[in-house]
Structure formats: C-alpha cells, structure tokens
Amino acid sequence: EAGKGDSFGGLVVCAVGLTAENHDEIASTTICDSKQMNDNLILQLAPWLKERVAYHEINLFPREYNEQWLAHGSNVNTLLTDMHAGCIKKVAATGDYKSIVIDRFSPRLPVTKKLKTLSANTNIIEQPRAEEFLPVACASVIARATFLEQIKVLSQDVAIDIPLGSGRPVAAALENYRA
C-alpha cells in the first residue's frame, strides 16, 4: 500500500499477479520495494509494469478514505484488510496462481483469514517486509505511483505543493494552506 504513513493524501492498495512468462523479464529490471526507489523512477516504471502484469488497485482519495475508515470502525487495519483482500481476489481471478504473498501489517494475519475462500491449492504467505518477493515489490511500485499522482491532483486542487510523508514540511504546508 501507499499513503498509510503520510499526513496528506488518501490510501492506495495494489495486488499484482506474475506468471512464469513475465517473471523473468520483470526480475531483470531495477524493480524492488518502492521505499528503496526514487519517485521519478517509480513514475517511469509503473506504466511499463501495468502493461505486463495482472494487477488491481484501490485508490481512495482523502474524503473517500475518511468515509471508509469510519465505515470500518475507525480502524485502518480493518480497512486495509478489506482493500488487500479485494485486490487479491480480483487478481486471483485472472489466473492460476499457486502462491499469494501479502505484506503483513498485523500479527493476526487478517488478510489470510479473509481469503480463506480461495482455492485450497493456493499457498498464502503473509509476512512482514514481503517486498522482497517480486509481485509485492511490483505492487508497491504501482501503488506508490498512483499515490504520487493523487498528491499531484490534490496539490493542484488546493494550489500548494503538498509534501509527502509526515515530517517537518507538513507543518509548513498546513500554515501555507491556512494563509
């Protein structure tokens, strides 16, 4: 996912399915966890990836994110569980995937529990830092690119440069917006 730790913007979740046919081509690129890549490279690679993989993403802008957060009991993990499971089910319907790898955000394995209706032949792995698996890295790149595009739209809407993250530039952006 992308946007979870940012002060501004919404939330984007993505799932990617790789096949034997596209795995090697993608593995030969510089794609890795989006946190280890610069944003310009992410924005260049995401469209290329989208042409080559099965993927589904859910892009919640701030208002919709806030509505969904409330609808999920003001619990971001419950919302993330539904978003991840929804994306994974859409991608799983596109092919015969033997394994599903999920970047774990809760020790209770909520996405695994939500996906129990998938094929008994599907191995579900939910672990922290799952971006070491290529499909999860690809999903992180696509989600980050979508989030960056979302921030660009929001910046244009309010006519200020909205900072990424949650650090020091956020306070200055809030002051500029109030002014």
Model regions and ranges:
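RNase H-like, Mg2+-dependent phosphodiesterase core
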Residues: E1-A179
